[in-house]
Amino acid sequence: MPLSQAAWARIVPFALFMLLLALRGALPEQNALGLDPRWIYALNLVVVGGALAWFWRGYGEFDRQNRPSLREAGLAVAVGLIVFGLWIHLDAPWMRLGEATAAFVPMTADGRVDWPLIAIRWLGAALIVPVMEELFWRSFLMRWIASPQFETVDPRAAGLRALVLSTFVFMLAHTLWLAAIVAGAAYAWLYIRTGKLWCAVIAHAVTNGVLGIWVVWSGRWEFW
């Protein structure tokens, strides 16, 4: 069965993000283009953000009637903070799947912190990635596992099988596999519990945003 327009609207931004991530990992620091691979994150803001803007009207889960209540938003923030707290402690060697695809150390050649790079990285992680990933992993993949006509699936009825399988695939896309299981299951649980993708997006954004601040404060660049 061919994928619907709604499916492609959720797949394309994610595919563009993964393509740029692979390019950043494959491009050596010294390359013929004279391009610093770390600045590919700026392309993410433009390319992936542009794709999300292009398809935005097709994302019904972000309509006004699907916004979370104050209580639901508070729950999402709490979940995001809990995931952050667990994520930074789930980094033992056995909790890793190989090495990160592309290391990100925002330091200049003379050892100074490169704040423009940090700003670009943080904005992408806290604003673009949560929307793009939740649209793909939860809105599309989790519901598609429940039924190929995923647009008709109420997230509250997606079921345990869809949660587990989508979280497993989510894990495969991350180096810290155990942390990814915790995060993926938490965001999926929020989506199923509230029926609102905004809650998963808020939690994801809180996790990524606070993680970025912590990374800069602690100098633990390996978490980026």
Language-model region placement:
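Transmembrane helix-loop junctions in multipass membrane proteins, especially transporters and channels
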Residues: E29-Q30, R57-E61, A92-A100, H174-T175, ...
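Juxtamembrane loop-transmembrane helix junctions in multi-pass integral membrane proteins
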Residues: M1-S4, A32-L35, G111-W115, G195
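Structural signal for membrane-spanning alpha-helices in multi-pass inner-membrane proteins
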Residues: L21-G25, V48-W56, V83, W87-D91, ...
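Juxtamembrane helix-loop-helix connectors linking adjacent transmembrane helices
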Residues: L35, E61-M132, M142-A157
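Transmembrane helix-loop-helix hairpins at the membrane interface
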Residues: L86, V113-W224
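Alpha-helical transmembrane segments and their membrane-interface exit regions
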Residues: V47-W54, V105-P106, A185-L197
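Alpha-helical transmembrane segments in multi-pass membrane proteins
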Residues: Q5-Y59, N66-G80
